[in-house]
Amino acid sequence: MVSKRRAYDVTVRTLRRIHDTLRRTKLLYAFPFGSAFDKVLRVLEEFNKSTKMVNIKKLGIGGGCMFVFGILFGWWGFPAILRSQIKKAIALKPGSEIREMWSNFPLPLDFKVYLFNVTNPDEIKEGKKPKLQEVGPFFYDEYKVKLDLVDREEEDSVEYSLKSTWFFNPKKSNGLTGEEEMVYPHLMILGMVGATLIEKPAAVGIVGKAVDSIFHKPDSIFVRAKAKDILFDGLPVDCTVTDFAGSAVCNLLKTEAKDLVPDGENRYKFSIFGGKNGTIAPQRMKVLRGVKNYKDVGRVLEYDGKPALDIWPEDHCNAFNGTDSTIFPPLFGPDDDIVSFGYEICRSLSAHYKHHSKIKGVNTLHYTADLGDMSTNPMEKCFCPTPDTCLPKNLYDMTKCLGVPIIGSLPHFYDSDGKYLQMVDGLHPNQEEHEIDMDFEPMTATPLLAHKRLQFNMFIQPVPKFKLMKNFPEALLPLFWVEEGILLDDEFVNKVKVVFKAMAVVGFLKWLMVLGGLGMSVAAGVLHYKSRDSGKLDITKVTPKGSSKEDGKADKSWPPSMNISTIQAASVPSSLDRN
């Protein structure tokens, strides 16, 4: 195309030179074709000039438009459109894809349980330090389904009940089957004694008689049981007893112990998770849908029909801060904390940004969380049992929350007071395995990788009025710890990557349009400048010099009267004059 355009220009300019030469010699109109030649040349020149100018203008206008569009669309338009679409997509509207995934997530959570086997139960009875052996993970596929959803358009909320189900996964349990026999503290006995010591220490003797009746005079607080019985299948609780102490404690257990599973008339099974497995939690949760304001998506409004908890002495500790931990508002950055309410622990937790990370090729933000420090943080004092009995960093007394004297911590007492680590043998805390962490893609608020970890412990101490613990040492005894985690599979990660592929394409196109538009505009300016003189013919006047001699020879030169800058009339041959 360029060569044809250039050939056309050269042709027209050559014809113009011929035309000017003929006109100066007065020969242009001496021939019949002269007038026609003049008209044709004028038409060709006008066409050439108009075509070039139109194309240059189009080039300049097109380049300018491309430049402006690249800036507006690439740096403002597309990001605004993308943010708008994300805000709409995250809303929990009935029938939407995100609503379906939120209410019935198709992937199971990774639920790992680690039990602490007691290797020296007899020595503990004599006051020696407990020696522990971690056994795990017992791996379970955990499915959480939200049921009986009720929408309230006026407040932009949705209310639901939660059902949790665990399925044992032997392939991921590293050879463990659940049949492993362990020496383990009887959690019901230990809990009964611990709760009595807190609420009514004088009644410990009655509890001792009830233990002999209900559990048939055990000789140790430690029992030998299979892991699956401790976790899900349950240990026997015999409430067919008729003595006063046994009957009184059994009546209390029937009303207060939520994890008892009936196993015949007045007989029950007690386990850590068995009472929750496959059942619908009685407490309903109400959260905002994020239709009116995307920043509110998932934010907890009510739990168990209440706008706040009523177990802590201060309002800010009872408040529902953050989401229900299954969805988070999008479009956040490193300056924003990730806050969620954990109904299992009766409080909200905040995760703080640590550093950038990358999961399966997606750029993410790495967050970590802990249980706080009630002993030094004034805002967390209200989580202490009393203002004067606050536990140190990353130890959380959950007695008021659970109704039993459980102390929460990070696994292996990670990042806590070292004195508790010295009370037992067999713990080896490390950050990678025992920290609460998560990796979020911040634009869509997608957690690509997450580990929620919590260890459950109980205090043991000498109890003179209870023979099974009469000579016990003082220690915070680890019982078990759990990890609830997720690593999104490739199918879901690819859905997240679609957003970034679109961003990458637009990022390439915006620079292509900006640089291309700028180049076209510059090219149009240069062509316009050159086109102004494209029809001119520069003629340089040459004046001959006088003759000179060199080496004795005269130089040949044009006649002095001859000016080669103009066309001279030719001499008429003599033969023509004779006619």
Where are the language model's segments positioned?
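Compositionally biased, intrinsically disordered low-complexity regions enriched in proline and serine
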Residues: D9, D20, A30, D38, ...
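Extracellular or lumenal secretory-pathway regions
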Residues: F47-N363, D370-Q568
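Alpha-helical and His/Cys-centered functional microenvironments
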Residues: V572
